Curated annotation (Swiss-Prot):
<feature type="region of interest" description="Ser-rich linker">
    <location>
        <begin position="79"/>
        <end position="113"/>
    </location>
</feature>
<feature type="binding site">
    <location>
        <position position="280"/>
    </location>
    <ligand>
        <name>substrate</name>
    </ligand>
</feature>
<keyword id="KW-0732">Signal</keyword>
<dbReference type="InterPro" id="IPR017853">
    <property type="entry name" value="Glycoside_hydrolase_SF"/>
</dbReference>
<comment type="function">
    <text>Endo-1,4-mannanase, a crucial enzyme for depolymerization of seed galactomannans and wood galactoglucomannans.</text>
</comment>
<dbReference type="GO" id="GO:0030248">
    <property type="term" value="F:cellulose binding"/>
</dbReference>
<keyword id="KW-0964">Secreted</keyword>
<dbReference type="GO" id="GO:0046355">
    <property type="term" value="P:mannan catabolic process"/>
</dbReference>
<feature type="region of interest" description="Disordered">
    <location>
        <begin position="79"/>
        <end position="110"/>
    </location>
</feature>
<dbReference type="Pfam" id="PF00150">
    <property type="entry name" value="Cellulase"/>
</dbReference>
<dbReference type="Pfam" id="PF00734">
    <property type="entry name" value="CBM_1"/>
</dbReference>
<comment type="similarity">
    <text>Belongs to the glycosyl hydrolase 5 (cellulase A) family.</text>
</comment>
<feature type="signal peptide">
    <location>
        <begin position="1"/>
        <end position="18"/>
    </location>
</feature>
<feature type="binding site">
    <location>
        <position position="420"/>
    </location>
    <ligand>
        <name>substrate</name>
    </ligand>
</feature>
<dbReference type="GO" id="GO:0005576">
    <property type="term" value="C:extracellular region"/>
</dbReference>
<feature type="region of interest" description="Catalytic">
    <location>
        <begin position="114"/>
        <end position="456"/>
    </location>
</feature>
<feature type="domain" description="CBM1">
    <location>
        <begin position="19"/>
        <end position="54"/>
    </location>
</feature>
Length: 456
């Protein structure tokens, strides 16, 4: 999730001849397009990286804006950040080739069973019911094993069964010694090196191993739509093209699939993996929904060919649906995604969606209940579970979010929810605080987490 441009920057850029259409981007750091919206629409600042054409005073349907990435927080000023051991030197070969920095074998596994979809619920270690969990994107980037163990201790003690964390960390140059990264995409040689060293995938190894020991199940996205921790743009810098072309660029897709193979094969036999996610919040602004749909169809089939043991999900925000639509931005297909269409892909095992009312410009938080039930209806019709995999409010963690939890818990088609995001005190200080963070042991933890788990 990325931050997007200020109103001051918009005025400094100046007017551009072409007007931006409804829900289009009209400002943001590094943005060079139009800043004037079509009649009836106004350019609204959402964050430092993104301003959007939203309905003006003449427009009557409910407003919805979207902070493109409210849940990504970086602990440092670099795009790949967080410390570890010195990176190994990278090796590379011909264009679009992928090499591995060290040899590696799959990590050993412990007892436990693979998570399955069973009707409209998940079966986890023999139990078929509703589950609660959380997100902690930063966990594989920690270098102190005791910190990782402590996180899993707290999750286990609280009864949170599912954890979503990043399975990607892409860079375009070898970072400073002591920085974790998983892939190096070198623009000077158009080659990619997968880092399986002590400051690479071995950090993810430890997370998977610790999850096994604690009986926690992991959801792992394999690339980021946003620039945080490299994302799709890290591929583009090395192999060319544009963000909208990422999904169809043959060189990029071959590199992406090579990374998928390396990671999925590494943990294919681990019962700690709940599911692989194609990406975090895939978007293709202005594209036909066929672009993401075709990519998701091909990629999910590829993952299943490598690993029939684990489920696959899209990792999408859940945009683009007609059920209960109020005509607002999240219900539209403007970002190139069609939730119902993607849900029907044969190798997609369950539906996922996210919810951030404040960042979407929604002032009535009860709107979130409609968002939950809209997706649940589609999941129920498809015969697949629905996972409410990201949600939150800045600073206020115990009002609307608790109502959303109750709606999810009592709605047919819903199988689990994961709040954004988990926090605790580590050996280096507090884990990242993006104002959505709910810290272990606080009063917010009691009302938003412990009380929620007790209701299940």
């Amino acid at each position: 999730m990325r931050p997007l441009s200020s109103a001051a920057l918009l005025s400094a850029i100046g007017a551009v001849a072409a007007q931006v259409g409804p829900w289009g981007q009209c400002g943001g750091q590094s943005y060079t397009g139009g800043t004037s919206c079509v009649s009836g629409w106004a350019c609204v600042f959402l964050n430092d990286w993104y301003s959007q054409c939203q309905p003006g005073a003449e427009y009557t349907p409910p407003l919805c804006g979207r902070n493109d990435n409210p849940n990504i927080f970086q602990a440092t000023t670099t795009s790949t950040s967080v410390s570890a051991t010195a990176p190994p030197s990278s090796t590379s070969s011909s264009t679009a080739s992928v090499s591995s920095s060290t040899s590696s074998t799959p990590i050993p596994t412990s007892s436990g069973s693979f998570v399955k979809a069973e009707g409209l619920k998940f079966n986890i270690d023999g139990e078929t019911k509703y589950f609660a969990g959380t997100n902690a994107y930063w966990l594989p980037f920690l270098t102190n094993n005791a910190d990782v163990d402590s996180v899993f201790d707290h999750l286990q003690q609280t009864g949170l069964k599912i954890l979503r964390t990043w399975g990607f960390n892409d860079v375009n140059s070898v970072p400073n010694p002591g920085t974790v990264y998983f892939q190096l995409h070198d623009p000077s040689t158009s080659t990619t090196t997968i880092n399986t060293g002590a400051d690479g995938l071995q950090r993810l190894d430890y997370v998977v191993s610790a999850a096994e020991k604690h009986g926690i199940k992991l959801l792992i996205p394999l690339v980021n739509n946003w620039d945080d921790y490299g994302g799709m743009n890290a591929y583009i810098k090395a192999y060319g093209g544009s963000k909208t072309e990422w999904y169809t660029n043959s060189k990029i897709q071959s590199v992406y699939q090579a990374y998928i193979k390396a990671v999925v094969s590494r943990y294919r036999d681990s019962p700690a993996i709940m599911a692989w996610e194609l990406s975090n919040e895939a978007r293709c602004q202005g594209c036909s929904t066929d672009v993401i749909y075709n990519w998701a169809t091909k990629t999910s089939a590829y993952i299943k060919s490598l690993d029939p043991n684990h489920m696959v999900a899209t990792g999408e925000e859940g945009m683009g649906l007609t059920v209960d639509s109020d005509g607002s931005y999240p219900y539209s297909t403007y970002e190139g995604s069609d939730f119902e269409k993607n849900l029907a892909i044969p190798h997609i095992d369950f539906g996922v969606f996210h919810l951030y009312t404040a960042d979407w410009g929604i002032t009535d938080n009860s709107w979130g209940n409609r968002w939950v039930t809209s997706h649940a209806k589609l999941c129920e019709a498809a015969g697949k579970p629905c996972l409410f995999e990201e949600y939150g409010l800045k600073d206020d963690h115990c009002s609307a979010a608790v109502v959303w939890q109750k709606t999810s818990l009592t709605t047919a088609g819903m199988a689990a929810d994961l709040f954004w995001q988990y926090g605790q005190t580590l050996s280096t200080g507090q884990s990242p605080n993006d104002r959505y963070t709910i810290y272990y042991g606080t009063s917010d933890w009691q009302c938003a987490v412990i009380d929620h788990v007790s209701r299940i």
